[in-house]
């Protein structure tokens, strides 16, 4: 494997998709204490593609939610390959609202190729569930931090990433759709996926440059699986500083900053001389 500074977007995507890539539950176990997982959306059922609950961090209670993939075929079937259904997003929203009620900071780990697009998910209101999360997260009166730890795919990722600060691990990706999908739609040729990955600007460094994310967390060469403790320690230190800073910010200022952060994404200024 090349030095991390020399990796192409496609190589980073390959690392992000590795079965060995550390999952949300692994980071939760290393970063937080006394994690207690909650289940169910109180409307339809539970979704194992999203895990969440209450934990202790730096002596304070926090709410932690993460999209969860599996390590093998059986686990991935149970977790639906990390593609959440409507009940998963509604479970996440239940935990977000509970965090707000008890004034607990919220930390989200994003790792999904996208929301589940099966017929049953559409029948249960997948679009509505995602949209409800977007508007609700924008208005949460608590500090919110989201970290893309693997794949950040489309609205399925954004539904857990409307946050005061959005971070990415160095070899994670965040995009509207997959390079394979992009190539199929734009060029009618999915074999040009590597080329699409270059064009789409899906890497942490690219997105940091565009102001879409706020921080890039370094990984060891070859990916986080080669030293998850190093990555977890870096996340812990950065979370401590960020939560302290956000907790000292007034609610109105917090909400205004969050709103303005997302309003700036995609903004451009035309040159009046041309």
From Swiss-Prot:
Annotated GO MF terms: acetyl-CoA carboxylase activity; ATP binding; carboxyl- or carbamoyltransferase activity
Recorded superkingdom: Bacteria
Pathway named in the protein's UniProt entry: Lipid metabolism; malonyl-CoA biosynthesis; malonyl-CoA from acetyl-CoA: step 1/1
Record's keyword terms, sorted: ATP-binding, Cytoplasm, Fatty acid biosynthesis, Fatty acid metabolism, Lipid biosynthesis, Lipid metabolism, Nucleotide-binding, Transferase
Entry's EC annotation: 2.1.3.15
Record-linked Pfam families: ACCA (PF03255)
Record's catalysed reaction(s): N(6)-carboxybiotinyl-L-lysyl-[protein] + acetyl-CoA = N(6)-biotinyl-L-lysyl-[protein] + malonyl-CoA
First-tier enzyme category under EC: transferase
One of the record's GO cellular component terms: acetyl-CoA carboxylase complex
Primary location class: cytoplasm
Residue ranges of every copy of the CoA carboxyltransferase C-terminal domain listed in the record: 1-245
SUPFAM superfamilies listed in its UniProt record: ClpP/crotonase
Localisation per UniProt entry: Cytoplasm
Gene Ontology BP, a term: fatty acid biosynthetic process
Subunit structure: Acetyl-CoA carboxylase is a heterohexamer composed of biotin carboxyl carrier protein (AccB), biotin carboxylase (AccC) and two subunits each of ACCase subunit alpha (AccA) and ACCase subunit beta (AccD).
The protein's role, per its UniProt record: Component of the acetyl coenzyme A carboxylase (ACC) complex. First, biotin carboxylase catalyzes the carboxylation of biotin on its carrier protein (BCCP) and then the CO(2) group is transferred by the carboxyltransferase to acetyl-CoA to form malonyl-CoA.
Protein family per UniProt: Belongs to the AccA family.
PANTHER family: ACETYL-COENZYME A CARBOXYLASE CARBOXYL TRANSFERASE SUBUNIT ALPHA, ACETYL-COENZYME A CARBOXYLASE CARBOXYL TRANSFERASE SUBUNIT ALPHA, CHLOROPLASTIC
The protein's name: Acetyl-coenzyme A carboxylase carboxyl transferase subunit alpha
Organism field: Clostridium acetobutylicum (strain ATCC 824 / DSM 792 / JCM 1419 / IAM 19013 / LMG 5710 / NBRC 13948 / NRRL B-527 / VKM B-1787 / 2291 / W)
Gene: accA
């Amino acid at each position: 494997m090349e030095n991390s500074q020399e990796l192409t977007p496609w190589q980073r995507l390959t690392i992000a998709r590795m079965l060995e890539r550390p999952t949300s539950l692994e980071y939760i176990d290393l970063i937080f204490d006394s994690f207690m997982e909650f289940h169910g959306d109180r409307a339809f059922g539970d979704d194992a593609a999203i895990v969440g609950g209450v934990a202790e961090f730096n002596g304070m209670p926090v709410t932690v939610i993460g999209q969860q993939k599996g390590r093998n075929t059986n686990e991935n079937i149970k977790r639906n390959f990390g593609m959440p259904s409507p009940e998963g997003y509604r479970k996440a929203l239940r935990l977000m609202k509970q965090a707000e009620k008890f004034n607990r900071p919220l930390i989200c780990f994003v790792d999904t190729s996208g929301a589940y697009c099966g017929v049953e998910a559409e029948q249960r209101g997948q679009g509505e569930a995602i949209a409800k999360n977007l508007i609700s997260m924008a208005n949460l009166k608590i500090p919110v931090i989201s970290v893309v730890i693997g794949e950040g795919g489309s609205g399925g990722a954004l539904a857990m990433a409307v946050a005061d600060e959005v971070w990415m691990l160095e070899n994670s990706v965040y995009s509207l759709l997959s390079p394979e999908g992009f190539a199929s739609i734009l060029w009618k040729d999915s074999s040009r996926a590597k080329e699409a990955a270059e064009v789409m600007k899906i890497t942490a460094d690219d997105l940091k440059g565009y102001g879409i994310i706020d921080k890039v967390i370094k990984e060891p060469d070859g990916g986080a699986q080669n030293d998850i403790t190093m990555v977890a320690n870096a996340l812990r230190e950065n979370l401590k500083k960020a939560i302290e800073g956000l907790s000292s910010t007034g609610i109105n200022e917090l909400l205004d900053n969050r709103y303005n952060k997302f309003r700036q994404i995609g903004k451009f200024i035309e040159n009046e001389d041309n």
